[in-house]
């Protein structure tokens, strides 16, 4: 009979097989009521699952991350229950957990409307209020097929076909509604009270635009009402910061249907984009990178050699000319190897750091496109470092330091790092992987940076480090990457002459700091809500006159500031000064300079900030010095 070992090391013995729920009840009524599921010998199981031999057990409650994920998964099933009651002809497809929520894909004869979503949410609350038990039944495959045939659930039958080796499957019954899942799920709907449906969208069966279109219902769920309210507040704040709305309001960019996933940059937005590019160009030049430019359209033969044609063709835009097939490059790496291959290199020339602001195109599904955050045409701050195995650690350490410095300049100090190690299927010897993983780990350790280990999550051709920024709302954006590659230099014949005069393949480090410029601009817009630090602001100062008498001095100040390397504009419109100040404050211009008769007489400017602070009057040269200091701080706090 089982002896159960709990996380604190205490043990409980039973004279009969017991469920997770029964063990929880033996500990206390409060824990029994809070039990969502269990973790038996490290494996998540339902609260009703039986333990019949000695085991370790962790009781999972809504306070645990796994408990929250189970609540979200069960909410997806609850969507199915409500939809089938309201729209009996709907066919249920899949309902997975996603970051901070869940969705359910549904086949229905018409698109769902916001009114439908409200009705589904209301019915879900009604079902939750009955506090019914969710019943799990492990069911033989043949019976599962009969269950879904009887209900006309064609997509569920297709999913069963996808699992030919599964002879028994978990069916979860929400009263008359049944769904198929590996689980676990909550034992009762009382755990699901803190949820909200958030949006509707279209989707495709299996994510393929050639397949039938489905309706996708998104939602979020939390452990309690307080967490849900905090999330809703965060979402409302995020909507206020939506880069698409701010981009339009500030005249930064737009997108349109005739060029899906492509950006029309307006003067203000293009100015911001160029500031990023010029900054990164200087940073990379100062750190030993050589800037190059490679073709946009490349013959399919190179993509076949690199492996992209076989593995990435669906995401590539292709064309044909004079009986030859070409692809618009989705990435820069194969072209950078071609530059390295021009002339045999010596070990003395390594490391060689080749950088490109590489314009790439990827055929992303139209449903996945989102403003400038997810596009089809984008530019990367892409670079590839060709080095020896012995140089891997030093190059990695230098890149990590550079990356963290860049992020600080943009105002991001909370950076998460993940080290992904060897997957089961991989190229290269275990000894090479040992050295590569050790090099990346040592580089992170030498920088004194904490990181999460992701075993088995590396690419087949090498381990990698991912850098993710946390913005002012706590959202995490994966931007930077350092990817070691043992494969591509071999495939594309990259070699150097080593110290012993033999030829060797270099290790290739794929690296990016910002990632996509377009996406990074979107992140900056939302992080700063359009109120960029002075160094990034498209217009750093606007000079305004009170009456026509000051116009000449306004123009003179504008010329002085622009000749000093700043981005200044004048506003000579025949409008009240209060109107001008309000307008440029809404346009998020950092500094507003007002010139009246007194300022003309004293040859000064009255300086206000967009936040409303009055900095007083000062000579133009003094303001230029003040602005230069603000620009030099970049996005770092004043104390740095």
From Swiss-Prot:
Cofactor note: Binds 1 zinc ion per subunit.
Positions of region (Catalytic): 242-533
Compartments where found: Cytoplasm
Pfam families: HGTP_anticodon, TGS, tRNA-synt_2b, tRNA_SAD
Cofactor(s) of this protein: Zn(2+)
SUPFAM superfamilies: Class II aaRS ABD-related, Class II aaRS and biotin synthetases, TGS-like, ThrRS/AlaRS common domain
Domain of life assignment: Bacteria
Molecular function as annotated in GO: ATP binding; metal ion binding; threonine-tRNA ligase activity; tRNA binding
Domain TGS, first and last residues per copy: 1-61
Keywords per UniProt: Aminoacyl-tRNA synthetase, ATP-binding, Cytoplasm, Ligase, Metal-binding, Nucleotide-binding, Protein biosynthesis, RNA-binding, tRNA-binding, Zinc
BP GO annotations: threonyl-tRNA aminoacylation
Residues involved in Zn(2+) binding: 333, 384, 510
Cysteine pairs bridged by disulfides in the record: none
Keyword Hydrolase tagged: no
Catalysed reactions, as listed in the record: tRNA(Thr) + L-threonine + ATP = L-threonyl-tRNA(Thr) + AMP + diphosphate + H(+)
GO cellular component, one term: cytosol
Functional description taken from the UniProt entry: Catalyzes the attachment of threonine to tRNA(Thr) in a two-step reaction: L-threonine is first activated by ATP to form Thr-AMP and then transferred to the acceptor end of tRNA(Thr). Also edits incorrectly charged L-seryl-tRNA(Thr).
HAMAP family on file: Thr_tRNA_synth (MF_00184)
Subunit structure: Homodimer.
Record family assignment: Belongs to the class-II aminoacyl-tRNA synthetase family.
Name of the protein described by the UniProt record: Threonine--tRNA ligase
